[in-house]
Amino acid sequence: KKFNYRIISYNSMTRAIVLGGSRGIGKAIAESLKSIGMDVFAASKNDIDTSNLDSVKKFVQIHNQTDVLVLNTGGPVAKGFANITEEEWNKYHNQLFLGFCIILQNIKINDDGYIFLISSSVIKEPNSKLIISSAYRAAFSEVFKILSKDYAAKNISCINIAPGLINTDRT
């Protein structure tokens, strides 16, 4: 396969939206983007709760266009399959899957922009104690992969970052 690499140039990009931007890896990303002169909206759970679809819909009405979008959210606590409740399945379906779908349907990414998905290493190596995270992050990663071909026509890069364990208050 031949890969077409382009040099990342932030000169023409001015705006970024970072979900989960108030702590952890999201905060580090937001601070890095600010350090290169971008106007960054580092969204906290008070700004958007991706597990609450009404919150997602309100957010995209206000924040509906950007140069860089970082899809990032925390995940469920470690729990065995038999102990997961129906409410937890529904909450994390929205938080890790459907909320991101609604965001991508409603936020315009400017041509030559970037979408970063901060998923998890569980998309490649599922973890029996993180079954909800493993399932929904892998499912959305597949949607993201398919959509990346459509975004490529506008020279929008879609990058899925799948980190391992991050030292935050969740770990």
Predicted regions and their residues:
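Rossmann-fold cofactor-recognition segment
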Residues: A43-D54
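Short beta-loop-alpha junction of Rossmann-like oxidoreductase domains
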Residues: K79, I156, L165-T171
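Hydrophobic positions on the long internal alpha-helix
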Residues: V70, G99-I107, V143-F144
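Rossmann-fold scaffold of SDR-type NAD(P)-dependent oxidoreductases
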Residues: L19, T66-G74, L96, L117, ...
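Flexible cofactor-recognition loop at the NAD(P)H-binding site
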Residues: R23, G74-V77, S121
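Catalytic Tyr-X3-Lys loop
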Residues: G75, A82-I102, F116, S133, ...
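Catalytic loop of short-chain dehydrogenase/reductase
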Residues: F116-F140, F144-A153, L165-I166
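N-terminal Rossmann NAD(P)H-binding glycine-rich loop of SDR-like oxidoreductase domains
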Residues: S22, A30
